A protein has these predicted regions:
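Canonical Radical SAM [4Fe-4S] cluster-binding loop centered on the CxxxCxxC motif
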Residues: 4-48
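Short microdomains enriched in Cys/His and/or Lys/Arg
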Residues: 44-61
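Conserved SAM/AdoMet-binding glycine-rich loop
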Residues: 57-147
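Conserved small/polar residues in nucleotide/adenosyl-binding loops
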Residues: 150-152
């Protein structure tokens, strides 16, 4: 398996298999977070992603849930996410959930039809770091948006 930088996942993903899709954070300005401060955002090379899927298939061919690492892999383009989801499906035919971190900005940057398609392809486990529903707290945390942007 290929991992660079820090690898972190929420506790409720502890049973999920981890595959690196990105490293670093696209925003990297939150006042409370130092996890990726010295790590620029970059996408994992597709060759490494596929090699990791092949390794996972070898040891866990019936994997039903995977977690893509990085601060916000959902920042990748729709086309890249679609390709990753289809690649996961090629290697792990029983995989039902592709989970990852996403920011409000990442979700808002995508069209509704794209979100629906990605969900249908198995990207249906987004962990969204809203941190608070209070604009003053969001400003103190330097999240870069107000709560109105987090609602539909």
């Amino acid at each position: 398996m290929h991992f660079t930088g820090r690898t972190w996942r929420p506790p409720y993903e502890s049973a999920s298999f981890i595959i690196q899709a990105t490293s670093g954070c696209t925003y990297n300005k939150c006042n409370f977070c130092s996890l990726y401060k010295d790590e620029p955002f970059k996408m994992a090379p597709m060759e490494e992603f596929e090699a990791d899927l092949a390794e996972l298939k070898h040891y866990q061919p019936n994997a039903r849930r995977i977690f893509l690492t990085g601060a916000n892999p959902f920042a990748m383009s729709y086309e890249r996410l679609k390709f990753l989801a289809l690649t996961v499906r090629d290697y792990l035919i029983k995989c039902q959930t592709i989970a990852m971190f996403a920011s409000i900005r990442d979700i808002r940057d995508k069209e509704v039809w794209q979100l629906k398609k990605l969900r249908a392809m198995g990207i249906n486990g987004l962990s969204i770091g809203t941190e608070s529903g209070d604009d003053e707290t969001l400003a103190l945390a330097n999240k870069g948006y107000k709560i109105g942007r987090a609602s539909c």
